[in-house]
Amino acid sequence: DDATEAILFYLESLKRPSKFFKIARRVTRKKPVILLKGGSTADGASAAVSHTASLGSDDRILDGAVRQSGIVRIHEFSHLVLAAKAIAPMPLPAGNKVGFVSPSGAFAVHLSDLCRERTCLIFPPLSERTLKRIRSICPPFINIANPVDIFPAVTVQGTEIAYREAIAALLEDPGIDAVVAVMILTEELTPDSYDFIVDLAARHWNKPVYISFSGDSACNAVAKAFLEPRGVPTFPLIEDPFKVLDILVRCRAAMKRS
């Protein structure tokens, strides 16, 4: 189906594995295929038998066949939903190089550790042009790197200008494949409009832009209600955009191998 751009599914057993993987190898050349497999443990397999009366394959054998066919396997149900949410409005990332706009140094450290230890993502050095643009909105004593700690710029420029300039600079950097911004939203820090995020995402349509929030739940809900209908996915936990990007980067790599 040419109108189907990605396939995400849950599976407990395979009755015709040869046919399944033959089709999978053909499909994964053109579009991402993401699998959540149930019954991978003895307890899970027993539960699968009890409600489907079917037997699953040996999980290690299945895992190897899945990788060889170009399917990307995940292990959390929430990731299936979040990956679908990210794929629907945004392109796949071209690679694993992420530009991150962080609202604090603590978030930057925590998420750098997460990406290094649990994903294939990297935060590459920024180009001199990108650094110069971001420095122009920051107090002079601030050291700029990737991840970008944007809070000092927010204190002098306000939320909208600081995030707009930082996100735009990262999207224009040829060494960046995707941009994640985490925003701390309160009544004092909420921008007048989120149009700038929608506009930047549309202008740089070939790079995904993901937004996550930390702060007042009512302010977060307003931002989500504005951004998502306009094609910018948002994520409830600050770790989620990076976990999703890891999945989608693996999808891109699998498509290239296929």
Regions found by a protein language model. Give the residues of each.
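Catalytic-core regions of core metabolic enzymes
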Residues: 1-258
